[in-house]
Structures are given as C-alpha cells and as structure tokens.
UniProtKB/Swiss-Prot annotation:
GO terms for biological process: signal transduction. InterPro entries: Kinase-like_dom_sf (IPR011009), Prot_kinase_dom (IPR000719), Protein_kinase_ATP_BS (IPR017441), Ser/Thr_kinase_AS (IPR008271). Residues 53-305 form the Protein kinase domain. It catalyses: L-seryl-[protein] + ATP = O-phospho-L-seryl-[protein] + ADP + H(+); L-threonyl-[protein] + ATP = O-phospho-L-threonyl-[protein] + ADP + H(+). One of its GO terms (cellular component) is cytoplasm. This is Serine/threonine-protein kinase ppk25. The keyword rRNA processing does not apply. PANTHER family: KP78A-RELATED (PTHR24346:SF82), MAP/MICROTUBULE AFFINITY-REGULATING KINASE (PTHR24346). ATP binds at I59, G60, A61, G62, S63, M64, G65, K66, V67, K82. It comes from Schizosaccharomyces pombe (strain 972 / ATCC 24843).
Amino acid sequence: MKPNTTNLRNECWDTFSIPKRSQNIKINQSTKHQRSISDFVGTAGPGRQVGNWIIKKTIGAGSMGKVKLVVNILTGEKAALKMIPFTPNNTSQTVRVQREALLGRLLRHPNICRVIDCIRTPACTYILFEYVPGGQLLEYILARGKLDEDLARSFAMQLINALVYLHKNFIVHRDLKIENVLLTQDSRQVKLIDFGLSNFYSKDDLLRTYCGSLYFAAPELLDAKPYIGPEVDVWSLGVVIYVMVCGRVPFDDVSVPMLHSKIKSGKLEFPSYISEDCCSLIAAMLNVNPRKRCSLEQAAKFPWLKKNSFCLYLPIPLTSIPSTPSIRSHVFKPPFNLKVLQLLHEHGLASIPELKHELYMAYIERKTTSLVCLYLLGVESLAPALRIPTALPPVYSRHQRHHSEILGAMDLTEKITAMQCPP
C-alpha cells in the first residue's frame, strides 16, 4: 500500500511563531538586499534570459510559491529559484521566509540543501538554492513501492547526521517528512530542505508552537503539550524510516480524529519482510512517551544502523558551538565580525548596533543564546578554510569506521588541526 500522497502533501495545522527567547531579535522587514539574483525580479517565464541566468522550467510548487530551474549561461551552473509572492499582513509567512533564507545561508552540511542567495522586493521574495536534481524522496518511494533496507539505512544515517548537526546548534527542524528530503542525481545522497518552521530550542524554555505535517507529527504535538524540540524530529524521522521500508505511513485513517487517536496510541504493525533490527529501531523512535523515546545518538547505536559501514561515510561537520572553552573564547569575542553581523542584518534581524550589543552581553554573561548560535554559524560559513564539502566522499572501509561514527565526530580543535588552520 502506498502512502496517501494527497494527505501527506496537504495536511498542516496551526501557525508559526517566534519563541520567547528569540523575541529580543527584532525582525527588520524593510531590509533590502542588493545581490546578483536581483536580475530575476519581475521575471518568471521559461526561456527568459536575465543577466547571466536563464529560467528553464517549473520544478516544484508549494504553499508559498513556485520553484524554477535556472541555469547560469556563463558557467552552466544549475540552481533552484524559489519565488514567494508577498502577502500583506501575513507576519508568520514573513518570519518563515526570512528564517528559511538565513538558516540556508548559514548551515553547512552535505545533507542540507544550501541557500546561495536571497533578495526581497515589495512584491516577492526570491531564494536561490543549490539544485538537487533527483527529486523528492516521496516520488522516489512511490516509483518503487518501498526501499530495500540497505538503501533505507544509508538515507536514515545521512538524515541522522543532518539532524544531529542541527541539534548541536540548538536548531530543531519541526517539519521533517519525505517531501522535504531531496535526492541527488545518482540517488545516493539525500538533502534536507524547508527550514521555514525551524526554530531554536532550549531545555529551559520549551517550545509551544504546533506545526508540521500530521502524518509525521509526534503525539505530544497533537496533545498541545510544550516540548523541547529534538524529540519531535526523532519521531518524524522514525516515520520517514517506516515509510521508506514499508511503502506506507505507520498511522493512517480517512478520519482525522481517528488518525489522531492512532498516532497517540503508537500501535505499530510491520510487514513480515521487515527485519527485527529495523522494527526495533523504529519502535524506539516512535515511542509515544517523549521521555522514553530514543535520542538520535542512541538510535545510531542500534544494530540496524551499525550493520555495515556503507552509511557511516562522514564525520559530522564542525558545530557552531565549540566544545573546547579555549577555542570558543578565541572564536566568540569582541570585536565581532562585521561581515557576519551584516549577513544577519540583511536577513531580517536587528540593526548592527543592536546585534553587537546583544552579542557583547552574551559574551560578558558567558551565555549561549540563539543569536550566539547564529553568529558562530556565520563565522563558520564565511571561513573558506573551514567550509564543509557538499558532496559525499568515497565510501569508508570498516577500519576507517571510527572516523565517521556519529558519536566520534571531531570537535573544533581537531577539525582546525586536521585542516592545518591553527586558531
């Protein structure tokens, strides 16, 4: 049985909001960007050449706008241009667009789709993404009915790597589903997209926004309970793994109230061909009690994910929060990097003087705030020597496995040393 794609694509509820701890970061909606993709403003037709880019065709459409394939006529580079029409008095959409553009620019991970550029005009916001030609994981599964466990294992481990990278930077995705996972041309690498519902989290300040897609939503969201953040991503990934190996969603019903009831019950049924190790992992990730639900680090230790080294391909990229205090003090201290502050300001945050003040207060008080996370990600993204590759390296052999285990990733000190870029 294939997933109910109509419901999977359309089911969404509630609105997006900024958590209390981020309210001190003001949204500057009047910011104007003067960047290379400004040539696209006012154009949309296929075959239209503007500047060094030509619009080819529509490759996607979502609730906020269309996505066009564009090609650079000088380099042949392909990119995806997302066009989001401005909607008056829609603050939630404005925040969602700004957040997607900002995080896409700052995050550097081979399993996260990168934002190349962004411009906002009075009529529309244009976001230029790296082009991921393999299409949605949803369509890939539908074309095959289901995936074999070896391939599903590889995709699952890549998504775990991406989510651990986010969570180490105190970011929760909150909208993980098979439509938000793209495949590269060779269908070997996955890329996580759509960070519009993402937010920063803290154990001391629970999130209270209930958003996402119902089939992939954790039961605590349906009960309108506050949550920390990572646990809802774990649940969603458990659903994604189930869909990959079974070809259908774990909880389904034509009645929304009945669907809610099934999700809250957590009762799982597996086809007979699914391995016991795979069933054990999914059951641990789909535990209805968020306190008993396994973490991503625990999931990575399950036998199903450790069965072979095929999927253990890459250390988690450099985290924005250095684990070594001496290195952190070297990276995060006044005077703050003006290019990073300008980048944050251009993507809708506070004025540069306000950003400087908030960062200085965090430095004095030795606090890790959401703004500190953004700043350190910005420092990392603008440092060429520390950039993370976006393509997969050759598959590691078993004797190299310890270099790519999810719990054995290098910390900042080791990464800098390995790249011969002393702090």
